[in-house]
A protein has these predicted regions:
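Beta-strand elements of modular eukaryotic interaction domains
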Residues: 51
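Generic recognition of cysteine residues
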Residues: 5, 9, 95-98, 180, ...
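Domain-length cofactor-binding catalytic modules of enzymes
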Residues: 25-46, 55-62, 68-74, 78, ...
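BZIP DNA-binding basic region
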Residues: 1-17
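A generic, well-ordered mixed alpha/beta core segment in the N-terminal half of proteins
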Residues: 88-148
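Low-complexity, highly charged intrinsically disordered N-terminal segments
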Residues: 19-24
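Iron-sulfur (Fe-S) cluster-binding segments and ferredoxin-like electron-carrier domains
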Residues: 13-14, 98-100, 345-346
């Protein structure tokens, strides 16, 4: 398991201040505002590195699901002046959540229809893990309004991207059917830009590393926070391709949701569906904060402006939430994107009980496909307690709807 420890410098313990749910420390003379109770040692190292950046703006924010990442913790929110950091966005650019409420009462859906027609139908129509469609999907599903011919990575990946759109991916990506606290069926899914986002992220991070070395940058290469300045043409190139990946990730989720709705409507012809809620959690955007126009990097964090509707999923077999943002300026109008890992995937496989995980899900009558130890990578025990995460961000979001899983498909 990842070690949960105090901040690297003991003197920081004396600098800790609490403001409702938020805690504040100073690191390298930079305020770090935290909504997280425990942070692993790797994440603390990344926080220390981030606070050395000369272009960091105002403060660094860490959401309650924060844990170690690559360059920047997952659950981190970083504002910068005049630079973008590809690794502070991550490689699953535009990854996010979407959810749809139906008019169907869960108790009125026959179990055999749920298992044999709906869940089986989803598995047949939506490729999972590293799988993709054998044939390119219709171009109408792809993002529009972009000059892809000027995009180095996207342009050469368009053919394969048309086979990836409408696919779930692996890791912590999922499709869930859920029961709302009023008894109605919801559909929720978590997915991103597939291999396209990874190709774009890796390409521009490597480009930034090369340029930073050429410029004798003061940002050390070993902290994995290479940057592209606004004045450089590479900034505009990355920004255009990042925005395309965000749009592609949304198009990917929309296509999957449309096909899930079709499957449900085929099985239950009286089904109707409300408009889709969508929110991304890996991206950078120009925003105004504390009187200045800055670039906000959200890596495993979502925008939570006043009245903004969002989605915060729990871990496998636990509650998920539809929320309303409270627009807290101290978090750069952000909140968590989920529960957040408490242990690595390898530690979860090594230490958690397969029998206990299956028994826990089946005791709740949740339809699942857990078969082997590798499936423990995404077990609930590998994640933080979602109820504690939500309590820690009571000043960031307000819970509107509580959702409980009835069936889950993992990538």
């Amino acid at each position: 398991m990842q070690k949960h420890c105090a901040p690297p410098c003991k003197s920081l313990q004396h600098q800790l201040k609490r403001h409702r749910n938020m805690k504040v420390i100073a690191m390298n003379n930079v305020p770090v505002k935290l909504w997280v109770d425990q942070l692993d040692a790797h994440a603390w190292e990344e926080v220390n590195n981030l606070t050395t950046l000369p272009f960091l703006f105002h403060h660094l924010a860490l959401m309650p699901d924060a844990h170690g990442g690559k360059g920047m913790p997952i659950g981190g929110v970083l504002a910068t002046k005049g630079v973008v950091i590809p690794n502070a966005v991550g490689v699953d650019i535009g990854c996010g959540m979407c959810a749809v409420k139906t008019n169907l009462l869960v108790e009125e859906i026959p179990q055999d229809v749920l298992r044999k027609e709906i869940m089986r139908g989803i598995r047949k129509r939506i490729p999972l893990g590293r799988e993709h469609h054998k044939a390119a999907q219709d171009e109408q599903y792809m993002p529009t309004g972009f000059d892809t011919e000027k995009m180095t990575v996207v342009n050469r990946q368009l053919v394969s991207a048309r086979k990836q759109i409408g696919t779930l991916g692996g890791g912590n990506h999922f499709i869930e059917l859920q029961r709302c606290n009023d008894g109605y069926l919801w559909i929720m899914l978590h997915s991103g830009s597939r291999n396209l986002g990874k190709m774009v992220g890796d390409y521009y991070n490597q480009m930034a590393e090369t340029l930073n070395t050429r410029w004798y940058s003061s940002v050390k290469p070993d902290i994995k926070l290479a940057f592209l300045p606004l004045r450089a043409p590479e900034f505009k190139q990355y920004w255009a391709e990042m925005e395309y990946c965000v749009a592609f990730a949304l198009a990917n989720r929309k296509l999957m949701m449309e096909r899930i709705e079709e499957i449900i409507a085929e099985a239950l012809p009286n089904a109707t569906f409300e408009p889709m809620i969508n929110i991304a959690h890996n991206y950078a955007a120009w925003e105004e904060h504390f009187g200045e126009n800055v670039i906000v990097h959200r890596k495993g964090a979502v925008h939570a402006g006043i009245g903004e509707i969002g989605i915060i999923p729990g871990s496998q077999g636990t509650h998920s939430y539809i929320v309303e943002g409270l627009g807290n300026p101290e978090s750069f109008l952000s909140s968590s994107h989920g529960a957040g890992r408490a242990m690595s995937r390898s530690e979860a496989v090594r230490s958690l009980s397969l029998e206990e995980e299956i028994a826990r899900l089946e005791s709740q009558n949740i339809i699942h496909a857990i078969r082997g130890r590798q499936d423990l990578e995404e077990a609930a025990g590998a994640y933080k307690n979602i109820d504690e995460v939500m309590a820690n961000q009571a000043d960031l979001v307000r819970i509107l709807t509580t959702l409980s899983p009835i069936a889950v498909i993992k990538g």
